[in-house]
Amino acid sequence: MIDSDGFRANVGIIICNRFGQVMWARRFGQHSWQYPQGGVDDGETPEEAMYRELYEEVGLRPEHVQILTSTRSWLRYRLPKRLIRQDSKPVCIGQKQKWFLLQLKSSESAINLNACGHPEFDDWRWVSYWYPVRQVVSFKRDVYRKVMKEFAPTALPFQSREHHSNNRRGRRR
């Protein structure tokens, strides 16, 4: 579903464990890592798309997770020119994303990267909360920074305050 500005509606999924770590997944056959994400189909709500993508990409069902929060608004990023398919109609110039923060309620053994037979990812691991902001491909970095900042009070109430106070202290020097 591409809007009149050329942005494809998409959902992003951040899965956290009880230790405040987040699931970080490697794209199949590539060296790039990212959060699970995927398009919103016509007639589908963002929450419905999130649950569909959650199963397709990491094999988790609604009973395996709890929604903690979602972004207040859609966050956008533009694709680099080399990734824009000019021959497709309408032309997609980027993604507009609704993000969801999920708590894994089940054992991590429920995660199955091959649940649908055409895996998006070939590996995953738990990483520290802020790690993905530094590691994601550059054109997604601003969106990752915004979503992580918005979700920090929910995902890491104590660590979030500590992270921000450390940053402030560092700037005064």
From Swiss-Prot:
A motif (Nudix box) lies at residues 38-59. PROSITE patterns: NUDIX, NUDIX_BOX. It comes from Shewanella woodyi (strain ATCC 51908 / MS32). It comes from the Bacteria. Accelerates the degradation of transcripts by removing pyrophosphate from the 5'-end of triphosphorylated RNA, leading to a more labile monophosphorylated state that can stimulate subsequent ribonuclease cleavage. Residues 6-149 form the Nudix hydrolase domain. The gene is rppH. The lineage of its organism: Bacteria, Pseudomonadati, Pseudomonadota, Gammaproteobacteria, Alteromonadales. GO terms for biological process: mRNA catabolic process. Its EC number is 3.6.1.-. This is RNA pyrophosphohydrolase. GO terms for cellular component: cytoplasm. It is an enzyme of class 3 (hydrolase). Belongs to the Nudix hydrolase family. RppH subfamily. InterPro entries: Nudix_hydrolase (IPR020476), NUDIX_hydrolase-like_dom_sf (IPR015797), NUDIX_hydrolase_CS (IPR020084), NUDIX_hydrolase_dom (IPR000086), RppH (IPR022927). Its cofactor is a divalent metal cation. Keywords: Hydrolase. It holds the Pfam family NUDIX. One of its GO terms (molecular function) is mRNA 5'-diphosphatase activity.
